[in-house]
Structures are given as C-alpha cells and as structure tokens.
C-alpha cells in the first residue's frame, strides 16, 4: 500500500511538473483535444534551429484547418519519457507527441493510434518507417533519419602522417592508425558513457564490421543469440578498447551529450561514432573542424565475412495519442510536420537528414555526400531493435564492463534474460 501511495504521489507531482513553465500541462492538453486545439509535446520545438520548421508545419496545417489552434510544449529531453509515461498512466496528455524510433515507441503503442489509414500518401516520399512500427502497424511518421556514422578528423590524420582520404578498412589497420594518432597527441575515440549511451553508439556504429551478415539479420529480425560469436566479440571489443586506453579519459563520467562530442570537435579525439541528425552530427562538426576536415567512414572489418554498412533508421517521429478526440485531425498535423517544405527547413537550419527523400542535399559538403551515398546499402541500427528495458540494462552493464565489475559472459547472460519476450 505504501508503494502504491508513493507512486500516486509521484505521478501527481510529475503531471504537475509537466505544466510548469509552459502554457500547457496534461489537463490543458486534454481540453485541447476537442478539435479547437491540438497540443504537441516534444523536445525540439523550443530549439532555435527548429523555429522555421515548426512555423512552416503550422502554416501548412492552417491551410486545411484554419480554426484549429496548435500549441507546442517543449519538454526537457532528460525528463521527456518520464513525463510522457506519467501522462500515459493518467490516460490524458498531448494529442500529438514526439518519439525516438525503436524501443521507446514500440513499448508504448498501446497508448497510440495506428496511423496507416491517414498517411498512405506519404509512404513513398518518406523513409524510415520501420522504426515506428510494430506488428505490421505504423504509429508515427518519421521526421528525420538517424544513424551512427563514424566521423574522423582529417586534420589529425594528416598530423599523424596518415592518408586522410583513405580511412582504415580492417580493425588491424584501424589499430595501427590509432597508434599513430596517439603519437600525435590525440585519443582514438571520443567517448561518453555517463548515461550508458556510449555502448549504443559503439554497438551500432561498429556492429556491421563485427557480426556476420546472418548474425546481423537475425538480430534485427528479433532472433537474437546473445552467445553468437559476433555478439560476444562486440562486447569484448567494447572492453578491450577501454582497457587499451583508446577512448578519451573518464568515459563513464563523461556525458555523450555534449561533452564527448566536444572532445572530438576540439581535436582531442580522432574518431567519433556520432549521429546523422539533430546533434553530434556533420553540421556541428563542420562548424568546429571545417567541412574539408570532417571525414565519414563505415565500420572496419573485425570478423572475416562481415559486410560493413551504415546503420540507420527513422530517427524521430510524431505520433497520435489514443485519447485524442479527433485522430484524423491530429494525424493531419503529423502530416504537416512531415511536409516537404517544413522538413527542408529542418534540414537547412538544424542539419537533420530529413526523412523526405526528395530534399536536395547536394550542397551540404563531403560528409553529407558520403552519408547519403551510404544510405542505399545501409541497414537498421542494432541497438534500435532492442526494447527500452534491455537498452537501459545494457547501459548499466557497459559501465560495469569498463570498470571491471562484471565480465562479458556475465553481462551477456543478463542481457539474454532481459531480451526474452514477456
């Protein structure tokens, strides 16, 4: 009873918090679902780089729904899924909400509307749908494509006497480059694992060079064998890289966002498994290092027979809450949020690789050109296939692997148990 009372108190507090400092909390969002007002929760609309995107999306929606008010409530990302979870528990909240692709949305589809009947006309234009679907149904429309290219600093390669236009193809070559880079005064990897996020980037960024094609495809299909040789090698490599001092110092006390990225941008590390969109990506790195010094490479081959590819999925996407009173109206807003003009602004201002395949990115520089070219042979990211519960556990275990308080075999045993269907 005490636990139940405590949870009730926490839930009330979180719901109250979600309205603090903004024009709308869950109660107002509930009132807003009568057709006269739609409330959107996200963590993007408050960013200056998203201002033009939001403005164009609202203008597009207003053409068809001039009498409907749209209100965006930008929540802090660190608390976003806690606040959203509280709203879901209460059965009331925003009409439209932003999700990361993968486990975060798949774990919550019972609270969302399947939007397939509303977005059929957008299926060919937009890419990245699979990350927002479950059991053959679609629950959000992709705004961005998100992936994990391996960025490298061409200026550091030159300083180390390496060919900046010929990144390593094998792990042996990669380690040799790391040794040369160390002599030049830099670390091999920028790494931040304070929140347990570093292992996600490592797994997806390097995984296609470690797992065999069958191991990779089985993993994505949900037939995961946590004792498969490639899977075990991936976690061994995570520990080996740390033990060998290839990471920037203090990985477990360094935040990925944005301290680890800053290490790469400042020239303290030669490689960074980053993002394609939003942050820690080509546009940020271009600003600090200059476009001509930002290289992009795919994973070096660790296991014979591995076929390296760019790991990517739908990045972020907007979904419709089950409690909204007019799902079609809310879905129309989602369509406006994924309209070509709006997404073109998001690409131009924020550097997002938009889900809209018709947007011209030819003037963005060599890093983007490489990323876009690699999309054709790309595959879904390994960590995106996991549930949020398993992702959280993997983050904690990755920290323990670095500190030496758990072995690879023990970690894999726990992860296998977590990954079993409920």
Region locations from a protein language model:
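Extracytoplasmic "Venus flytrap"/periplasmic binding protein-like
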Residues: 59-126, 159-161, 166, 262, ...
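Extracytoplasmic/periplasmic solute-binding protein
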Residues: 139-143, 148, 173-224
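Extracytoplasmic/periplasmic substrate-recognition and gating elements
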Residues: 63, 160, 243-247, 285-349, ...
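Hinge/lid segment of periplasmic solute-binding proteins
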Residues: 100-149, 175, 295
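Short, low-complexity disordered leader/linker segments with a strong preference
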Residues: 1-39, 63, 119, 358, ...
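Short, well-ordered beta-strand elements
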Residues: 33-46, 68-73, 95-96, 139, ...
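Glycine-centered hinge/linker elements that transmit conformational signals in sensory
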Residues: 176-178, 220-252
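C-terminal capping/gating helix-and-loop segments adjacent to ligand/active sites or protein-protein/ligand interfaces
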Residues: 349-353, 357-358, 367-419
């Amino acid at each position: 009873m005490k636990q139940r009372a405590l949870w009730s108190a926490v839930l009330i507090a979180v719901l109250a918090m979600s309205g603090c400092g903004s024009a709308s909390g869950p109660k107002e969002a509930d009132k807003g679902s009568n057709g006269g007002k739609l409330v959107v929760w996200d963590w993007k609309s408050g960013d200056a780089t998203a201002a033009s995107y939001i403005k164009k999306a609202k203008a597009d929606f207003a053409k068809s729904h001039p009498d409907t008010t749209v209100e965006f409530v930008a929540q802090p990302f660190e608390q976003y899924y806690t606040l959203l979870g509280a709203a879901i528990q209460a059965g009331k909240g925003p009409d439209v909400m932003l999700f990361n692709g993968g486990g975060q949305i798949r774990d919550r589809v019972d609270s969302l509307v399947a939007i397939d009947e509303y977005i059929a006309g957008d299926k060919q234009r937009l890419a990245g749908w699979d990350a927002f679907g479950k059991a053959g149904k679609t629950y959000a429309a992709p705004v961005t494509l998100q992936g994990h290219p391996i960025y490298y600093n061409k200026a550091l390669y030159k300083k180390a006497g390496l060919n900046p236009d010929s990144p390593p193809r094998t792990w042996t070559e990669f380690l040799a480059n790391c040794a040369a880079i160390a002599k030049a005064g830099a670390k091999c990897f920028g790494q931040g694992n304070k929140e347990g996020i570093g292992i996600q980037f490592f797994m997806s960024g390097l995984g296609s060079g470690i797992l065999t094609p069958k191991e990779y495809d089985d993993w994505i299909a949900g037939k995961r064998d946590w004792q498969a040789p490639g899977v075990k090698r991936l976690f061994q490599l995570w520990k080996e890289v740390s033990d060998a001092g290839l990471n920037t110092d203090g990985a477990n006390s360094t935040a990925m966002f944005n301290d680890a990225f800053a290490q790469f941008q400042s020239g303290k590390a030669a490689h960074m498994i980053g993002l394609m969109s939003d942050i820690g990506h080509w546009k940020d790195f271009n600003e600090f290092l200059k476009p001509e010094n930002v290289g992009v490479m795919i994973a070096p081959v660790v296991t014979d027979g591995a076929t390296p590819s760019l790991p990517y999925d739908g990045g972020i996407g907007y979904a419709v809450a089950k409690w909204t009173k007019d799902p079609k109206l809310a879905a129309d807003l989602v369509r406006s949020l994924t309209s070509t003009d709006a997404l073109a602004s998001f690409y131009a201002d924020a550097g997002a690789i938009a889900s809209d395949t018709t947007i011209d990115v030819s003037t963005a520089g060599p890093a983007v050109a490489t990323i876009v070219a690699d999309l054709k042979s790309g595959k879904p990211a390994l960590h995106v296939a996991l549930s949020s519960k398993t992702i959280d556990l993997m983050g904690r275990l990755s920290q323990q692997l670095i500190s030496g308080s758990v072995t690879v075999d023990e970690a894999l045993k726990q992860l296998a148990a977590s990954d079993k269907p409920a």
